[in-house]
Amino acid sequence: MSLERFVKIKYQTNEEKADKLVEGLKELGIECARIIEEKVDLQFDALRHLRENLNDDETFIKLVIANSIVSYQLSGKGEDWWWEFSKYFSQNPPEKSIVEACSKFLPSSRTNRRLVAGKIKRLEKLEPFLNSLTLQELRRYYFENMMGLRNDIAEALGSPKTAKTVVFAVKMFGYAGRIAFGEFVPYPMEIDIPEDVRIKAYTERITNEPPVSFWRRVAEETGIPPLHIDSILWPVLGGKREVMERLKKVCEKWELVLELGSL
C-alpha cells in the first residue's frame, strides 16, 4: 500500500526554474496555445486536410479518436504519422467499420509499425463505444463534456483516466471538434497532460515530482489547462525544423516559448 495518502511527500524542485516556467506561461496565456495549435501544429493541418476530403464530420471525428488511441510507440515523428493517416483516409475513406479500416491501414503504415497486433486489439475494444456515437453526441462532448469523453474512452479501453493515449485522444478530439464545429472550446483543467517521453524528460529538469501532479499544479497557478500547456511546450521539445519556422512566423512571443523549452 502506498503511504502517499498518509505522508505528505516532499519533492525536490528547482524553484528558480519552476518560477520562470509559471511566469512565462502566464505571460503567454491560453491564446498563445491556441495560435500554436491552429497555426504551428502540423497535426492540426493534417486533420483539416482529412476533413476537407472526407465531407463526413461523424466519420472524421471517429477516425481521429480511433487513430489517437494507437498513436504510441511510433516508428516516425508524430507529425509525419498524422499526415500519413490523413492522406491515407482522404484517399481511402472507410467503407464499413472504422475499426476495420484502421486495422487494414496499420500493418502497411510507415510511421506506426510497432506493436500492431496490440493496437488492433485496442481498436476492437473501442469499437462498440465508437459505433454508439452520433454526430449530435460528438457535438455534445465537444461543447459540454470533454471530461465525459475522457471517462468513456478510459472505460472502453480498461485504462486509467490519466493514461497517455486516453488524454491524447481528448486533445486530438478537441482539434477535430474545433475544425468540424468551427468554434474554439478550451480543454478542461481536469484533463491531464499526456505523460510522454518528452514531457517526462522536461519535467525531470525541474522536479522529481511525478509529471501529472506537477503539471496539474502548474495549470492551477497559470490558469492554463494542462493540454494547452502541452501545446505551448511541444514545438521546442519536438525539435522539428518546419515547426520551429512556423512558430517564429506566427507567434509574437516565440522567443519566450524557446526560453521555456531551454529551462
Curated annotation (Swiss-Prot):
Keyword Transmembrane assigned: no
Keyword annotations of the record: DNA damage, DNA excision, DNA repair, Hydrolase, Lyase
Region (Helix-hairpin-helix): 139-204
Catalytic activity: 2'-deoxyribonucleotide-(2'-deoxyribose 5'-phosphate)-2'-deoxyribonucleotide-DNA = a 3'-end 2'-deoxyribonucleotide-(2,3-dehydro-2,3-deoxyribose 5'-phosphate)-DNA + a 5'-end 5'-phospho-2'-deoxyribonucleoside-DNA + H(+)
Any GO MF annotation of the entry: oxidized base lesion DNA N-glycosylase activity
Source superkingdom: Archaea
Binding site for 8-oxoguanine: 43, 71, 82, 168, 194, 230, 234
Alphabetical list of Pfam families matching this protein: AGOG
Active site: 164 (schiff-base intermediate with dna), 196
Residues spanning the signal sequence: none
One biological process term in Gene Ontology: base-excision repair
EC number of the protein: 3.2.2.-, 4.2.99.18
Entry-linked InterPro entries: AGOG, AGOG-like, DNA_glycosylase
Role played: DNA repair enzyme that is part of the base excision repair (BER) pathway; protects from oxidative damage by removing the major product of DNA oxidation, 8-oxoguanine (GO), from single- and double-stranded DNA substrates.
Free-text comment on this protein's domains from its UniProt entry: Contains two alpha-helical subdomains, with the 8-oxoguanine binding site located in a cleft at their interface. Contains a helix-hairpin-helix (HhH) structural motif and a Gly/Pro-rich sequence followed by a conserved Asp (HhH-GPD motif).
Family: Belongs to the archaeal N-glycosylase/DNA lyase (AGOG) family.
NCBIfam families: PRK13280.1-2
UniProt-recorded name of the protein: N-glycosylase/DNA lyase
Organism from which the protein derives: Thermococcus kodakarensis (strain ATCC BAA-918 / JCM 12380 / KOD1)
